[in-house]
Amino acid sequence: MQGAVDLLVDGTDRRVGAIRVEGPPAPDHPSKAAPIPRSCNGEPETEGNLVRWSFLECDGGVTSVVNRMKDEGQFKRIRGQAKYTFLAIKAILKWEKQSGTIKIDLGDRTPVDLSGLFCMSMCQTFGGGYRVAPGARPTQGYSSLVMAWGLSKPQMLGLMGPLEKGKHIGRWGVTMQDAMRFEFGDVTGPPMFLNVDGEAVITTPATMQYHDDQLTVRGADSIPNEVSGADGEI
């Protein structure tokens, strides 16, 4: 406790970025009310859309299905990371193929098989310790975009272990790159949920835009991720 107090009093301030996320709001559910627009998030570019700001990461695909299932109360009697493991297995086994399009920064819009996931992140870990974006750090001045598309169900199941350890990049076509803007839409099936800092509050079509220098975070004088880029937790 004293260490936390000391950090609050004498810690080092760092400026970090944020991702502005815009898309249609997630629908209402008996176990989870529809998200409410807040004026502090700013006005949407498209009427009826919801705007949220992410200070950690936003993601979609199997991961957002998992979060929505959690919000709906599935496996509610199971606690901890085991809940997410069971939810992920169920989401993968019930996954139905659909396609969509993506656009990264100023590149062309590209069709993709959405069997898999994406994560636009400013930190290394999420979901109870999964190292989704190895080496990403909040002070890097851009987001790290991880994509895993066109996976079979066995591949999605097989990716869970490497994903937890940060050993998934390059496996089965999984990529990671720097990105400032990501557009995700034209989904052939039902709209896909998107997580914003762990909450499935937005659906496709959606845009994600990184903005630097948005928030001051106070912490230790020296943090590992600034030295080596190896630990991006925040």
Q: Would you name each region that the model predicts?
A:
Residues 6, 12, 56, 122-124, ...:
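Short, flexible coil/turn micro-motifs enriched in small/turn-prone residues
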Residues 43, 47, 79-81, 95, ...:
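Residue-level signal for well-ordered alpha-helical segments
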